[in-house]
Design a protein with these regions (language model features):
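C-terminal substrate-recognition/cap domain of FAD-linked oxidoreductases
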Residues: 1-59
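Short amphipathic C-terminal alpha-helix that caps PH/PH-like domains
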Residues: 2-5, 64-68
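Activity-critical C-terminal alpha-helical subdomain
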Residues: 56-60, 66-136
Length: 136
């Protein structure tokens, strides 16, 4: 999917990816917010695309993320750039479901990060504010 989009862009003389495309393999995890849930019994490949900002990057990134997020059960890497996609908070709530609720409950009960120093604005909106309306 990513390679196809890169090749299509090149045919139109657009080069949104100007550094690397890396892969990372993950096994299943019981961590509540891991991108590979514990019920998955296969190795999962995550793709990371690194690019210096250029005139074609934003459109490429948004198009690719929309395609990836359309895959049932897909879970984006928490540290990547997808915060501006419409409906992303709802998507995250859906795919993480009960795990997200459990994470928030434990976070509150154990008083983890009471000053929210480990939250960026997107995570603060998603985890603390009304997550359904965050970034819709």
């Amino acid at each position: 999917m990513a390679v196809d989009l890169i090749e299509a862009s090149a045919k139109d003389d657009r080069y949104p990816v100007n550094l690397t495309m890396n892969t990372r393999l993950f096994g299943k995890s019981t961590a509540l917010l891991h991108s590979v849930p514990g019920e998955v019994n296969e190795t999962t490949c995550n793709i990371q695309i690194t690019s210096f900002d250029n005139e074609h990057w934003e459109a490429f990134k948004d198009c690719l993320m929309e395609r990836w997020l359309a895959i049932p059960g897909s879970r984006p890497h928490w540290a990547k750039q997808y915060q501006n996609l419409p409906g992303i908070a709802s998507k995250l709530q859906t795919v993480y479901g009960e795990n997200l609720e459990t994470f928030l409950r434990i976070r509150e009960e154990e008083n983890v990060d009471p000053d929210n120093i480990f939250l960026n604005p997107f995570l603060q909106d998603l985890l603390i504010s009304d997550p359904v309306s965050a970034y819709q």
